Structure formats: C-alpha cells, structure tokens
C-alpha cells in the first residue's frame, strides 16, 4: 500500500469519526473558554493545542496535559473536548488538549517527539502560563496513554519533566504483537472481534511505519526496569471488555515491580474508549481520575 493510499484510507476513517457524538446543545453548554494554540517547542516541533480555561483561574493553578486516543491515526474529537472541560471544571485547572500529529502522514516517532516536546514546554514556561510546575499532570487515553508512557520513558534520560502524577488508561503497550493474537480461541471465532483486531493491526502498521516496533518509545512494555522506575505516581485503568486489558494490566505490574506507586483498577463492564465515549463505567472512571488528581495537587 502506498503512502497516498494509506492517507486516503485514514481520511475516510477520520471523516466518519471526528464529530457528531456530542450534541450542539451540550457543546454550547460546556464550561470555560476554549482557545486554539500552536506551540513551538525546544525540540523543533510545532504542536496543535486546544486550551480549556476556567472563568477564574486561581494563582499557581494546576495544568493537565491531555493526550487523546484514536489509534494514532485519528485526531481530537468533540468527546475529548467534553472530557477536558469536565476535568477543567471539577479541578478548576488549566487544560491543554494536545492534538498531536497523526499517522500515516507522520509515523513513529513523530507523535512521541511532540508529546515529550509539549510536556517539556509546559514545565519550562509554567510561570508565564500561570501554573505551578509541581502541579502538572499528564493524562493519556488509548494511543494517548502510549504517548504518555513514551514521554516518561524518554524522561528517564533527560530528567526534564516532573509531573506530579500521570494517568494512562486502556492503552497499547506492545506494538510488536498482532492484535488478533491477543484474542482468546472463542473470540477468534467472533466476526466482531476479528474485524476489530484487523482494524487495530492496520492502525498499528500505519503508526509504526518502517521503524522497529520493539523500541521502548513505541512499545513501552519493552522498557527496562531502570527507566520504568523513574515514572511518577500512576493511575492505570483497564476495561474488562477490551482486548488491550491484559496488556494494560501487565504494564501496571511492570511499574509496580520497578517500585512505582501505581493505582490500578479494572472496570469490568467497560469497553475500549469508555471514559471519553461515556459508555458503561465512565462515571466510575471519571470519579477515579478526579480523586487521584486531587490527591496529588
């Protein structure tokens, strides 16, 4: 498949998925003020960010950097904005929703560089942003969770990021594995799961490109214990009805064995993407997010 064919296929998926799940009435009622930004970072990236700001931002406020899901090929959605506005209101903090670059146009490691770059920028410019550098949170969902993990692994060498805590949920940690190999023998007979796994494989191939997927920045489960031991306190949520469940939980165990303070929770009834999609279990997840964040602010 040529790059042009990959891009055409990705654009078809994006056109179906991007908007429409949050009603215009609900969007109009979302709290705070949204500002679209382009941030130039020290590592040479120019990153698209949507800032969600409360009506009154307290001095030395917290900053939450949110990294959305979408299989590395889909961008920010109205569901992501709703999630960010909800966190902004509950925590009375500044939120940057990072609309990082997408595959296949920009394959690995471009999104990793952007994710690390925007986090580094936030710490370097905390004073002018009016936020407390000791109250910066990294939060990632699905593909975004992979990028948060990659930023933390990269930080094991640079030591420039000091997040007070991180959230990673229902995220891919091993891009060397064919998604269909994660299915049980029973699920391999189910057309729904077979089709879903084939789609995931396509997304992974678009993201990895010609790179070695065994690199820790691509497959965080491959990181050594020394790198993992540098992670801040983590909240890791898995979805009981997600074929990434076991991988997500395996990564939580690796962090625990490396000495990291990890709060891990499985939401049994949940499917992939449940937090931002607001499918069963999302209220429990959102409450867990807010409780964990408040404990670290």
Model regions and ranges:
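Generic N-terminal low-complexity/basic-hydrophobic segments
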Residues: 1-11
């Amino acid at each position: 498949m040529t790059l042009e064919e990959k891009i055409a296929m990705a654009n078809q998926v994006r056109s179906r998925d991007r908007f429409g799940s949050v009603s215009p009435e609900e969007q109009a009622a979302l709290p705070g003020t949204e500002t679209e930004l382009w941030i130039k970072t020290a590592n040479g990236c120019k990153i698209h960010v949507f800032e969600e700001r409360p009506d009154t931002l307290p001095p030395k406020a917290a900053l939450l950097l949110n990294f959305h899901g979408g299989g590395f090929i889909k961008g920010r959605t109205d569901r992501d904005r709703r999630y960010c506005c909800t966190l902004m209101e509950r925590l009375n903090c500044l939120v940057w929703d990072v609309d990082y670059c997408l595959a296949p146009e920009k394959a690995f490691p471009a999104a990793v560089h952007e994710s690390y770059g925007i986090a580094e920028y936030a710490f370097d410019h905390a004073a002018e942003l009016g936020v407390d550098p000791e109250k910066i949170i990294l939060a990632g969902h699905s593909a975004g969770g992979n990028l948060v993990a990659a930023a933390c692994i990269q930080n094991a060498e640079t030591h420039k990021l000091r997040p007070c805590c991180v959230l990673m949920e229902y995220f891919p940690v091993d891009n060397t594995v064919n998604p269909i190999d994660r299915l049980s023998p029973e699920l391999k007979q189910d057309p729904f799961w077979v089709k879903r796994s084939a789609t995931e494989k396509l997304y992974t191939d678009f993201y990895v490109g010609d790179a070695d997927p065994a690199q820790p920045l691509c497959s965080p489960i491959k990181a050594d214990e020394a790198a993992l031991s540098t992670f801040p306190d983590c909240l890791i949520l898995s979805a009981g009805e997600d074929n990434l469940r076991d991988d997500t939980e395996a990564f939580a165990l690796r962090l625990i064995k490396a000495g990291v303070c990890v709060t891990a929770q499985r939401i049994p009834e949940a499917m992939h993407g449940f937090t931002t999609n607001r499918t069963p279990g999302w209220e429990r997840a959102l409450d867990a997010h807010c409780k964990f964040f408040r404990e670290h602010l």
